[in-house]
Amino acid sequence: MQSPDGQETGRPAAILIAGPTASGKSALGLRIARAFGGTVINTDSMQVYADLRVLSARPTAEEEGLAPHRLYGSIDGAVNFSVGHFQRQAAALLSEMDAGSLPVFVGGTGLYFRSLDEGISDLPEVPDAVRQRIRIEADGQPTETLHAALALRDPESAERLRPSDRMRVMRALEIHAATGRSIGSFHEARVPGPLAGKPLLKLFLATEREALRQRIDARFVTMMEQGALDEVAALRERRLDPLLPVMRAHGVPGLIAHLDGTISRQEAIQRGQGDTRRYAKRQFTWFRHQMGEAWHWTTPEAAWSLVQARLSAPAGR
């Protein structure tokens, strides 16, 4: 059921908690799951990786023991885990959950949330051999050179992509090499989301900017105290492709540079803090422009009150 302003008012089939990093999403998700018999489901592209428990701010083992947590730390860093992988895993998990269990999706990755409801483009899987060939060809090449190569093969995609966006330029090159088609030609066909058409409570924790900045900076220092450098050192020893998502996580490039001896520990911390602050700003911007009016921009306490009100409503009301 909807109110006159278009907002859902009845009991939701799932709760979606998004927001910038360090905004209190995990704590709210755990609170809801404990109070209402829910399962906390990771919706963050870095917290899926087993390699980055500390640096991705995954829930602690103690927190995971207080309520069921799923899709956390289940993927090896060598895997290029995509939104398509996430959507399939989330759909499978939802089909396995007991009817009375409340799914509580928690994270900061906008495309993951979109895949749950609106669905995603049906992009083909790129064979590992093709991906490796493109990576070898691109090794040592400036991104602008790769963009020029894309313009010759797939001018439509090159027109849409910034010449400095290496990750997306590489993705377009891989898709074209694997299929002979523009990546844009796959965007019309969509895979529907597993929560499409269901009543949802969508919460975006819009923490005050200066307070968020201070929390981000303090949290990065705490991560260092909790072993983030050792975590990255172990990742560095694996010598993974630097374009893999796990190698581009906030804090990883700077800490690797410190381990390589090119910058100091303090410079690595400052770089990680700055990268994370800029990411939080992009999260605000993306959700504001991409996710529509169905999302409640709120604080953790106001969100908790809203959850209590919605979950006390009879089904179908």
UniProtKB/Swiss-Prot annotation:
Top class in the EC scheme: transferase
List of residues binding substrate: T21, A22, S23, G24, K25, S26
Cofactor: Mg(2+)
EC number in record: 2.5.1.75
Catalytic activity entry: adenosine(37) in tRNA + dimethylallyl diphosphate = N(6)-dimethylallyladenosine(37) in tRNA + diphosphate
Stretch list, region Interaction with substrate tRNA: 44-47
GO biological processes: tRNA modification
Residues the entry annotates as binding ATP: G19, P20, T21, A22, S23, G24, K25, S26
Source species, domain of life: Bacteria
Subunit structure of this chain's protein: Monomer.
UniProt protein name: tRNA dimethylallyltransferase
Organism listed in the record: Methylorubrum extorquens (strain PA1) (Methylobacterium extorquens)
